[in-house]
Regions:
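Bacterial N-terminal signal peptides that target proteins for export
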Residues: 2-17
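Boundary at the C-terminal end of the N-terminal hydrophobic targeting segment
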Residues: 28-34, 65
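Short, conserved catalytic-motif segment at the N-terminal edge
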Residues: 65-127, 149-154, 158-159, 207-212, ...
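Short, surface-exposed loop or secondary-structure junction motifs
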Residues: 109-113, 166-379, 404
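Short, glycine/proline-biased beta-turn/loop segments that scaffold the active-site neighborhood
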Residues: 152-167, 255
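Short, well-ordered beta-strand elements
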Residues: 364, 374-391, 512-516
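Peripheral terminal and inter-domain segments
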Residues: 398-678
């Protein structure tokens, strides 16, 4: 549910049918595969170490910004957000800023119901903050750690009534899950469902939708909604409370979050306050989004309630008289975790760093299909910022949340202009890191694995200025790629922005690219059969010859009839030719069926109810593969028949190669995988 990935990431999520995602490197020398989670410690020792680390963080360089006051915030945000929502065609937005334990500013902009012109109220209007919901799940985990009912470094399976796989011979821990290093494959089936009656308890959802483990736990970050839900289920089991009841008792009531709930449908008392969600503010409202993995993204909350949540975390677990976490537990939760390059943002326990202008900032973004939100905690200044938009908006108008955050930081917490010259090896290193990459948060073994090759990321070296750019990932407002210059060995910084990327090599010598958002990485594609260019050639040839063969079939018949020519083939050759044509038709039916299924998957409209149709489609694909063998026989027989034209023989050969390549593509990318967990 996290989609903090700008244009390229949005394309990935769209093509993968994901509604995911809202969504620092010189000193580290260990490769990603060798980086382990911290060794088990007692909670008190871990908290002391985390506190020491937090206290020893160098202070930001003193640069005077605008004084952070309600008056100045009003002038600043009133000039920015209305402009954003107008240009991007967003119906409404809400923002809250807290400082030193108090709500400093909160305001709604635009409409919660555009047709009725109902204004957004920061106190009452409910927005859907998506994956910011996860911060509640993580905080619940830490409460149970305090009570000794959960251990961050124990095998999570001891808290479950089903088994998370140990594919690599190593157990998955809650620390792995909270840092998004569970190693589990991406999964989206039934992430959202179409109506309330399709919702199932997480106790049933989790064992029936168990993904494969594609990385060793504690190694490669790969964001996971599923793993988050596993953590919530562990809380539910050890606490003995339904997760919704747990949230009400331990968070919403003591924090006076009167306009907040994870429940679906909303309680009757809250339904009148729910904002509509829109694709475009000028369009019609969409239905309420039913989130199957509720602990990962079903929160509905007002900005004021989210302000209380931020205050609690900024005050290390305290809100008013309520102590949600012990101070040492909160500090431990907010502390940077091991395993990320020193000069890049890292995961905390649930939160992740979004450091800017010399200030340490922990954050969490969130996205449903319609609502897009972000939460930032500027720890060294005791300031929190929450913003949410109730529309997807026009895709060509950039990232409103990211723009607001950077402008906010530059205004109130600016940094001096950095003088970071290029390294002497900038040209050589830019060329060495260029090439195709794949995202770690991906489908690897299920029917959506094909999205990995469709959305291959490319890092390109620009010889004109010795920079690199990431195809589609970091773009300026004008749509042009943002260029990065090497400022330290294998650390590249945007030439006109704060973004950084860094490269290390894993245990197999493949490059891993760390990004500003630390919950996933890019991994070098070094296998030719997995590269996009090769697969496009295979698919292009296969689809091309199949479609042309089908088209030529009636055309050739019409021409023969017109010129009164007979088909110069013996009965056996005619039979094989007929079977080859049927194989082509089957392949075309499969291709059209796959495009249909993929369209529904993009809209998250093909959940468990579509299993039979997908199985039928896979059977058609297998029949197409059998038909491919028939095209080989047809081609072989044509070459042994001296009466057939040479061009006919060549075409039969191309058809056989194309059909076999098409079938290889289906098998290689698991499109014929009869497991329907995806």
């Amino acid at each position: 549910m996290e989609k903090k990935m700008t244009n390229w990431g949005s394309r990935f999520l769209r093509n993968a049918a994901l509604v995911l995602v809202g969504c620092g490197l010189v000193g580290a020398q260990l490769c990603a595969q060798e980086q382990k989670a911290a060794a088990p410690k007692s909670s008190s020792a871990a908290a002391k170490n985390a506190l020491a680390g937090a206290m020893s963080t160098p202070a930001a360089t003193a640069v005077h910004g605008q004084e952070l006051t309600a008056t100045d915030l009003s002038a600043f945000l009133d000039g920015l957000i209305p402009q954003q929502i107008e240009k991007a065609d967003i119906a409404g937005a809400v923002v809250a800023v807290v400082k030193d334990g108090k709500v400093l500013f909160e305001k709604g902009y635009g409409y919660s119901d555009a047709e009725k012109k109902t204004p957004v109220s920061p106190q009452d209007t409910l927005f859907r903050p998506g994956s910011i919901s996860k911060t509640f799940t993580w905080t619940a985990v830490m409460q149970q750690v305090e009570q000794g009912k959960l251990n961050l470094d124990a095998d999570v399976n001891q808290y479950l009534d089903f088994k998370v796989p140990q594919t690599f011979g190593k157990p998955t821990t809650l620390r792995d899950i909270m840092t998004h290093r569970s190693g589990l494959e991406e999964t989206i089936k039934d992430l959202f469902v179409g109506e309330e009656k399709e919702l199932t308890p997480i106790s049933k959802y989790l064992p029936s939708h168990l993904p494969k483990q594609i990385f060793a736990p504690g190694t490669i970050p790969a964001y996971s909604n599923y793993a988050t839900t596993v953590a919530a289920y562990a809380v539910q089991r050890v606490s003995g409370q339904d997760f919704n009841d747990y949230l009400d008792e331990h968070f919403f009531k003591p924090l006076n979050m009167t306009r907040a709930t994870f429940r679906q449908p909303l309680p009757e008392s809250l339904k009148p306050f729910m904002s509509n969600g829109y694709d475009l503010g000028s369009g019609k409202p969409k239905h309420f989004e039913w989130v199957e993995v509720a602990p990962a993204g079903s929160l509905s909350a007002s900005a004021e309630s989210m302000a209380h949540w931020m205050i609690m975390h900024l005050q290390n677990g305290r809100y008013g008289e309520a102590q949600i976490l012990k101070p040492e537990t909160a500090i431990q939760m907010h502390a940077r975790q091991d395993g990320w390059p020193a000069s890049m943002n890292a995961m905390c326990l649930g939160f992740y760093e979004q450091n800017l202008n010399g200030h340490r900032v922990i954050s969490h973004g969130g996205d449903t299909e319609l609502f897009h939100s972000d939460l930032f905690l500027i720890l060294d200044s005791n300031v929190g910022l929450f913003v949410s938009y109730n529309s997807a908006g026009r895709p060509d108008h950039g990232d409103a949340r990211g723009d607001l955050y950077i402008r906010f930081m530059d205004r109130y917490f600016p940094a001096p202009a950095a003088n970071e010259p290029a390294t002497a090896t900038a040209k050589e290193d830019a060329q060495s890191v260029a090439g195709p990459y794949k995202i770690s948060r991906r489908f690897e073994t299920n029917i959506l694995a094909v999205t990995t090759v469709l959305d291959e990321a490319k890092i390109v070296a620009d010889p004109k200025d010795n920079t690199i750019y990431l195809d589609g990932l970091f773009k300026k407002e004008n749509g042009q790629p943002r260029h990065f210059l090497e400022i330290a060995p294998m650390l590249f910084k945007s030439v006109d922005g704060p973004e950084k990327v860094a490269f290390v090599k894993d245990g197999n010598g493949r490059r891993v690219c760390y990004l500003d958002f630390p919950f996933m990485v890019l991994q070098e594609v070094d296998v030719a059969l997995d590269k996009q260019a090769f697969n496009y050639v295979v698919m292009g040839l296969g689809i091309g010859v199949v479609v042309l063969t089908i088209l030529f079939w009636p055309v050739s018949a019409i021409l023969r009839k017109h010129y009164k020519q007979s088909l110069m083939l013996d009965p056996a050759a005619r039979k094989w030719r007929r079977w080859a044509k049927i194989a082509c038709i089957i392949d075309l039916i499969y291709l059209l069926g796959f495009l249909w299924a993929f369209t529904l998957l993009q809209k998250l409209e093909l959940g468990s109810g579509g299993d039979f149709k997908l199985h039928l489609l896979q059977v058609i694909g297998v029949l197409g593969g059998v038909g491919g063998l028939l095209t080989i026989i047809c081609a072989m027989k044509s070459w042994t028949d001296s009466t057939q034209w040479v061009w006919y023989k060549v075409w039969n050969t191309l058809l056989a190669v194309g059909c076999v390549g098409f079938f290889w593509f289906l098998v290689h990318w698991h499109l014929l995988n009869f497991s329907l967990n995806y």
